[in-house]
């Protein structure tokens, strides 16, 4: 006889900042949050660690106590990755509560997050403008000489 494993409730969300993309998987668990297999305590750079903790501090640790979140991040620089991670974590907790808990708690969590910082749930659409010919950058032109 084989024992039936408990069902895993999984939600996948993503956060983006410039070219950094973070994909978060929220499952029912004990409140672990890992980024590329490393716990949040060991995130580098140290001065931006608090930015990653913002979704946890805003919503409260009790909400995260029954959810495990695994985040994979790639692309971009260290600051862009931090912002992509925090967005993915915030979106995953909202999506998890919408799908597996109840609508009322989801709305409460979403309101708390939006009151604090809208960029935790809504991606920044600004991207780098491509370089064009006739100059050194996207808008800068080579100097013109009349003689």
From Swiss-Prot:
Does the keyword Ribonucleoprotein belong to this entry?
yes
Keyword list (alphabetical) reads: Ribonucleoprotein, Ribosomal protein
Keyword check for Ribosomal protein: yes
Name the SUPFAM superfamilies on file.
Ribosomal protein S5 domain 2-like
Which terms does the record give in the GO molecular function aspect?
Answer: RNA binding; structural constituent of ribosome
Q: Which InterPro entries match?
A: Ribosomal_Su5_D2-typ_SF (IPR020568), Ribosomal_uS9 (IPR000754), Ribosomal_uS9_CS (IPR020574), Ribsml_uS5_D2-typ_fold_subgr (IPR014721)
| GO biological process terms held by the UniProt record | maturation of SSU-rRNA from tricistronic rRNA transcript (SSU-rRNA, 5.8S rRNA, LSU-rRNA); translation
Per the UniProt entry, the signal peptide is none
GO terms for CC?
cytosolic small ribosomal subunit; extracellular matrix
Q: Which family does it belong to?
A: Belongs to the universal ribosomal protein uS9 family.
Name of the featured protein: Small ribosomal subunit protein uS9
Taxonomic source organism: Dictyostelium discoideum (Social amoeba)
């Amino acid at each position: 006889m084989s024992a039936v494993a408990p069902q895993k409730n999984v939600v996948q969300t993503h956060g983006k900042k410039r070219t950094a993309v973070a994909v978060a998987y929220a499952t029912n668990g004990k409140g672990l949050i890992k980024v590329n297999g490393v716990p949040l305590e060991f995130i580098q750079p140290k001065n931006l660690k608090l930015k990653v903790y913002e979704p946890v501090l805003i919503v409260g640790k009790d909400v995260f106590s029954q959810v495990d979140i695994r985040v994979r991040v790639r692309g971009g620089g260290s600051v862009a990755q931090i912002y992509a991670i925090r967005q993915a974590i915030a979106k995953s907790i909202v999506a998890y509560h919408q799908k597996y808990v109840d609508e009322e708690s989801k709305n409460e969590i979403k309101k708390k997050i939006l009151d604090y910082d809208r960029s935790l749930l809504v991606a920044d659409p600004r991207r780098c403008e491509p370089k064009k010919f006739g100059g050194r950058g996207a808008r800068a032109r080579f100097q013109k000489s009349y003689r």
